[in-house]
């Protein structure tokens, strides 16, 4: 973390702006997980996950997610989105041979994928929103684990700066203990604690880097907390139960059949085993298979679409304050 701090401080002299000016942006470059995925995982998994319908056009929700709804506030906004379902902040595949870490992405590799085909432009606003999968999907939920996640985020941001990124916006995490998945796993207390600790670490990081003028923090947890505290103000009546109780995929499968399952014929043997052993698909074994008819479910008043992901109504409610914050800190210039 020290090298990242020194690197950015070294760039302060090169980042001269008037005190009352807002840096301009015309494109958002997004790095994150399923909360921001607009179809990358669906494409990567050859239309297998998440099954659509019931999932909306490859999104992990029943409608558009917050990121794409930003275009309502910023007409003409260009988005380069590397976020996909399942990624962790930490590259666990580098420290473990467990197959479940070999197919799911991580933040550092998302950056690599972006740099292989694109580059950071002077008018890019880079957003990082990641970490929930480390804690909730994979169970790395101690304070030491949170420090490792923080370091992965800071290292990735440092790499972005070294590759030309000028403006970086960090998103913190909602209270993961309020997620239906945390309740079903009986990890409410641990999930709440680690997400709060994560947010404090991220706040401290943002404060340390404030002198650079390049890194800001959006505390999206406050919007989630407001929805839980006063759900009626957002048209919500149920903040605990998922609208949809099925799986991510139409046809459940288990590790023992992964090598022969015809549904996985498009993947090589290593990919099949990694997919079958991954927590992202764990509910595909134990839960009812995805149902196309579920796309017609009435989710009015529901905060959560499934055990992990919010409904599109909640995404809209998150998009509005995100847009307000972005507008207050940056100047949008449509191309």
UniProtKB/Swiss-Prot annotation:
Effect listed in the UniProt record for changing residue 34 to N: Loss of activity
Reactions this protein catalyses: a sterol + a 1,2-diacyl-sn-glycero-3-phosphocholine = a sterol ester + a 1-acyl-sn-glycero-3-phosphocholine
Tree of life domain: Bacteria
InterPro entries: GDSL, Lipase_GDSL_AS, SGNH_hydro_sf
Cystine crosslinks: none
Signal peptide: 1-18
This protein's UniProt keywords: Acyltransferase, Cholesterol metabolism, Lipid metabolism, Signal, Steroid metabolism, Sterol metabolism, Transferase
Class in the EC hierarchy, top level: transferase
BP GO terms, sorted: cholesterol metabolic process
Enzyme Commission code: 2.3.1.43
A Gene Ontology molecular function term of the record: lipase activity
List of catalytic residues: 34, 306, 309
Protein's job: Fatty acid transfer between phosphatidylcholine and cholesterol.
Family: Belongs to the 'GDSL' lipolytic enzyme family.
PANTHER family: GDSL LIPASE_ACYLHYDROLASE, PUTATIVE (AFU_ORTHOLOGUE AFUA_2G00510)-RELATED, ZINC FINGER FYVE DOMAIN CONTAINING PROTEIN
Protein name: Phosphatidylcholine-sterol acyltransferase
Organism listed in the record: Aeromonas hydrophila
